[in-house]
């Protein structure tokens, strides 16, 4: 079969990324591999397609693999929705009959196209050296990122580093044994090294922060070596590599925390100074977060029943200016998170969760449950409901700081600077400085943590970092991996 269908290229027409360099080309699903790769523009378009394929195939799966099995969810939806199987994640009752995710989260579809990009880019003489190396840096980084998800979720998985092309397909040898997790980790580290080498000294976000970059590779390197150090016996040597990578990112990534926590996720503040790599959503290609239906049908309450509830001021939700949510909520955040996961003064509470109350005839309010309030989308002109055109963060600078704190703590060093940078932003400088004896590391202790099912005081540095990661990364697909790593 000589003609090879490049199916992922159909994504190109959908990828006029806002704020990201893009190339408007018609879909080329009918173009054969032999007739493609004839110009620099075709390499550019294929690279756009790779990022679009990761977004369309796996954005929701990245969340599912990294969060619902943790301690964030598990209550019954207060609105009465049927959970339709997603409760198996929080109850950890997935099995051979209900795996939760099929086909390895569709990652191998994207991997095959990455492998093709690597091969053709290495072979070509159509690209200048800098452009060629940048594409290779992105491709090797993306491949390592995907295999890191596969490793953490499945352990032993099939390794494939060459594209499956029809002209090379041997149908008598389609089966391939899974490789041990140790070999998967070796490949991940090898690809990270290849990505770093290809990027060289180029730390730029050349095509925007919805494309892979050297800062993204350094973030991944820090995370990978912390995992291998703690989970796979790498120990001090791996912690040192992680620390060095994260300090390199800190010094050269041109990053800083946003002044306000809510600004990080604002629809009108995309690709801000804190973002490193995000999955883009935008009006221009009509792609909403998690392909819209996965977000809207899992995380958003129905308008009809919200008419019977109010906020903490007693204002009915349907009378709140700008409140126009409409969906289904199958992932119910545990009720106690609103009460026990954030200290007084922490702005991340209201930037993450919204409390739902029932107002009784005597005017008293009864707390019912929290809803997701980190990603708020936007209301388009002429629409009567919100559209989730928010970018979905994969890596951001607060994550880098807390990973660096973790590496330092594991090496017996003082992580106060990194932890307190995140906390100061969370509380605001004025409140933080006035209450350092209560909220600055290592002072966040006391009765708040008595019988707290989610967090502990600062007496243990690892508990302090894990606590900060919970408060910072709700809904960003990290908690399950964090619990396992710690």
Positions of the model-derived regions?
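Alpha-helical solenoid scaffolds that mediate protein-protein interactions
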Residues: 117-121, 150-151, 195, 242, ...
């Amino acid at each position: 079969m000589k003609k090879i269908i490049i199916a992922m290229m159909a994504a190109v027409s959908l990828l006029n990324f806002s704020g990201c360099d893009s190339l408007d080309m018609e879909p080329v699903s009918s173009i054969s591999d032999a007739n493609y790769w004839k110009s620099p523009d075709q390499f550019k378009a294929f690279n756009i397609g790779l990022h679009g394929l990761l977004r369309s195939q796996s954005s929701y799966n990245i969340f599912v693999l990294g969060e619902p099995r943790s301690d964030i969810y598990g209550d019954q939806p207060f609105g009465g929705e049927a959970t339709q199987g997603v409760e198996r994640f929080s109850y950890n009752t997935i099995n051979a009959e209900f795996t939760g995710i099929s086909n390895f989260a569709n990652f191998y579809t994207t991997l095959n196209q990455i492998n093709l990009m690597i091969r053709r880019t290495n072979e070509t003489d159509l690209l200048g050296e800098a452009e060629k190396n940048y594409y290779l840096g992105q491709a090797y980084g993306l491949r390592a990122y995907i295999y890191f998800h596969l490793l953490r979720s499945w352990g032993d998985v099939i390794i494939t580093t060459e594209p499956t092309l029809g002209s090379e397909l041997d149908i008598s040898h389609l089966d391939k044994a899974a490789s041990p997790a140790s070999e998967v980790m070796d490949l991940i580290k090898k690809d990270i090294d290849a990505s770093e080498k290809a990027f060289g000294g180029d730390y730029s976000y050349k095509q925007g922060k919805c494309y892979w970059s050297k800062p993204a590779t350094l973030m991944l390197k820090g995370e990978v070596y912390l995992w291998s150090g703690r989970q796979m016996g790498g120990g001090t040597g791996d912690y040192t590599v992680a620390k060095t990578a994260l300090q390199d990112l800190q010094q050269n990534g041109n990053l800083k925390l946003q002044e306000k926590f809510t600004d990080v996720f604002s629809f009108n503040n995309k690709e801000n100074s804190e973002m490193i790599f995000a999955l883009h959503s935008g009006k221009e290609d009509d792609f909403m977060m998690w392909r819209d239906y996965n977000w809207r049908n899992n995380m958003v309450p129905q308008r009809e029943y919200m008419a019977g509830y109010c906020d903490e001021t007693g204002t009915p939700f349907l009378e709140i200016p700008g409140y126009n949510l409409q969906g289904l909520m199958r992932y119910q955040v545990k009720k106690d998170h609103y009460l026990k996961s954030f200290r007084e003064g922490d702005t991340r509470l209201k930037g993450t969760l919204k409390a739902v109350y029932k107002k009784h005839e005597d005017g008293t309010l009864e707390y019912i449950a929290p809803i997701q309030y980190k990603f708020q989308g936007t209301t388009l002109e002429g629409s009567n409901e919100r559209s989730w055109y928010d970018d979905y963060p994969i890596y951001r600078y607060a994550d880098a700081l807390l990973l660096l704190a973790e590496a330092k703590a594991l090496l017996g060093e003082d992580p106060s600077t990194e932890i307190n940078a995140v906390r100061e932003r969370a509380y605001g400088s004025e409140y933080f400085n006035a209450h350092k004896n209560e909220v600055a590391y290592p002072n966040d202790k006391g009765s708040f943590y008595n019988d707290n099912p989610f967090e502990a005081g600062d007496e243990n540095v690892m508990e302090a970092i894990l606590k900060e990661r919970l408060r910072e990364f709700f809904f960003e697909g990290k908690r399950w991996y964090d619990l396992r790593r710690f």
